[in-house]
């Protein structure tokens, strides 16, 4: 809305500045979550939307029973309102990301709501994957019919994150890749969201770094210098990601140990999906596993645990996801969380480093 008004009033021309709007997006979304947090938590308590705790989980988690969940609604609402207020809504990429976000949010919300009204298992896993695949189909259709970079050979290529060399995989290959990326990021963040503040801070770090990459990709000179594939309008995604970062930081205020609220699937599936969608738009599909190393580690620990038990009848870890394994090794929850944050920051710096290394190797 502000961007729209700036086009009609010369006095508001300064509102078109991407730097100013990025700052405003961060502040506005942060304040929305911060000030709406307390009444929202009270509302969830009244409605008795509280977390259920696994009986076989660490004993320290039993005290978390009844902690309000579905906090992702607050994050999504803040990002949506901020984006509608500050983003350039004529930008196709912003509209694509907003639609994707709402679709992921719908999956998560239905899953959370069913846990309280129908079954503790929530939405069936196959249905979740089917709905996520539908979002993937929409993203693929955008690439196929509209395109990103204006070069189909690049749009349907996998980009080496270090050398920037494109590997053409075709439309079918890209369809498969998109499904893997979206299902992977969305569900990996969901798996990680098992300790107070564990998932939200890595998400903040990832969205911040992706915001920097989005700005570089949407800048003609910087994208050329850094061997990124220039995409018209992608710089606007840095404003959107600033809103995600601000909302995440505001949520961390209430989600840090001891948590007053949890994201629930509404939040974790959505923020993971957002990272995946924007990674695809920026042609950074292979940068995502580096940037989101902790999410990959958590997801792999579950896959290995299940696979090992089915094939050998033995477990690799004391409990999966791996953050529970560390807890059962008597490492305090807060220490596990902080170490995972540190690891995410390190891999985030490495991910940024690969951008700078492009063209050297």
Task: Report the location of each language-model feature.
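Membrane-interface helix-loop junction between the first two transmembrane segments
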Residues: 35-56
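Membrane-interfacial helix termini and the short, flexible loops that connect transmembrane helices
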Residues: 44, 113-121, 260
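Membrane-interfacial loop-to-helix junctions in multi-pass inner-membrane proteins
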Residues: 90-98, 117-131
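Select subsegments of transmembrane alpha-helices in polytopic membrane proteins
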Residues: 64-76, 127-135, 333-343
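Alpha-helical transmembrane segments and immediately membrane-proximal extracytoplasmic
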Residues: 52-69, 92-93, 211, 221-225
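Membrane interface segments of multi-pass transport proteins and intramembrane proteases
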Residues: 115-124, 156-167
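Alpha-helical transmembrane segments
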Residues: 2-41, 79-106, 139, 145-160, ...
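Juxtamembrane helix-capping/reentrant segments at transmembrane boundaries
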Residues: 54-67, 119-128, 323, 328
